[in-house]
Amino acid sequence: STAILILSYLKFLRFFLTSGRLFGRPLRTSALTAVDLTHERRTWKLFPAIAGLLNSRLVDGRFHFQVLATPFRMYAEGMICPIFEEFASSRQLMACDIEDAAARRRIMATGAFGELFVREWHDAGAVSTFNRDLDALHIERCPVAEWCGETFGAVYRRLRAYQAGGAAAARSPAEAEALASFPDPIGHEGALLLHLARRYDRDLRWWFTVANDRPEVLEQLLFHPHLLPGFNDSGAHLINLAFFDGNLLTLQVAQRRSLERVAHAVQRLTREPAEFFGVDAGRLDAGAQADIVLVDPEALRCYDTDANRRMVYRDIFEHEQLVNRSDGVVTAVFIAGEQVWDGREFARALGTRRLGRPLTAGTAATRRAAA
């Protein structure tokens, strides 16, 4: 991940140049991530330009950025969210166990924490992927029922009206009690989220879109020759994001354009990454291992990723996890020619005996392809 490296331009430069010959043998590098940020509309053009420079004859690099094939929607519970790793103040909260609400409240109760958080929130010069426009932050779950489905901006304006003497701004006794609990006057916008996090912690669940909300720009990124579809980062996060359907969404983006674009998307998801990493996969060759996925094109056309996210309990984690459920889209999966999914349930063999193989680099054919 390159996100933290951009805070130091020297480290940023040295890191990227390792993919070329300036430091000896090129390091094959797949970096996170090429994005179209919602609050900085020009940034997306930099990623293809950087990758193109590194892969030029001058640098002779082996480099690509990964691209997420859908709007990058991220969820937060209180301040439990990867985006808050960008703030020195809230990194203290991220270091606490997710179930340790008491520890987070002790940290947030201090005046030093509040001052630092509000200062960081309003630091316009900070390098950040977080769009801090309150109207772009949407409340999904909250003890105040009236706020569910609203933005923080709407709550902020209602609070300002209430504190200006408009008691009628409260729509229920519960909302009146919540509004009365805020510091009066509320002051800066950052103080709103600070108070809500202190009061509700993980009972406040909200979401925002970090990037990739413009379909025409997203398609350009997905099919740029120096970038590859990827960044389906779900396995690293339990409750904050779910993009397990990222490869299906790449096909969906292509499907909206043409059948030829779908064929190109299949190549982008299989042959191109296999050749980049030098592994023996992703090609329709006689005698190759038959790993096959069958997709229903009409079900894919109708699939809505935002409507099919679910929070489910996972025994393996002993915790809930945000997942995607693309029921009906994938009708069959074969590993080495053996069917392991029939569109309704998994085969008994899956997870009980060996079906596939490790994908390792090094065969003569893949060395030639990766050269």
Identify what each model region corresponds to.
Residues 3-232:
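Polyanionic/metal-chelating signatures
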Residues 240, 244, 248-257, 266-268, ...:
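Feature captures the catalytic cores and cofactor-binding loops of soluble hydro-lyases/lyases
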Residues 173-219, 250-300:
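C-terminal helical cap
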Residues 342-371:
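Intein/HINT protein-splicing elements and their conserved insertion hotspots or analogous self-processing inserts
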Residues 34-37, 236, 254-258, 310-320:
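Short beta-alpha connecting loops at secondary-structure transitions
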Residues 5-9, 35-43, 70-77, 236-240, ...:
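Flexible loop/turn segments at secondary-structure boundaries
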